[in-house]
Amino acid sequence: MGQKARIDLVLDCADPAKLAGFWRAALDYRDYYTDEAIAVLVPKDGIASPLVLQGVPEPKAGKNRMHLDIVVDDIEPEIERLIALGARRLDAGVQRLGETLWVRMEDPEHNEFCVCTGVEW
């Protein structure tokens, strides 16, 4: 058997401390570590993966090849809450695949993510 492994989620950004404010509130995470180059957020319950916001000098260019899904029970109230925190809705309507519904959004530094409900996995 190999070593235990885990996945930490890392987002490149221009201002880790500022973007941490958005994601801390969006995910109800807590601060673990922050400096000029990096901000690490961890779940309050210790169950989900940490989110690392890593400062990079180059601006974001193009669509993310990977994104986060925020899975909730009710999409519309969550979308409104995230918009109030500084997110922007990218889809006018709700996308559907079977029982799964989602809306594409982006954080204040234009990193795409989805708000989803009905996810079976």
Give short role names for the model-derived ranges.
Residues 2-11, 17, 33, 40-42, ...:
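Vicinal oxygen chelate
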Residues 15-30, 82-84:
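Amphipathic alpha-helical segments
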Residues 76-81:
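Short amphipathic alpha-helices within nucleic acid-binding modules
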Residues 7, 63-67:
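Eukaryotic phosphotyrosine signaling hubs
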Residues 45-48, 61:
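Short, solvent-exposed loop/turn segments that connect beta-strands within catalytic domains
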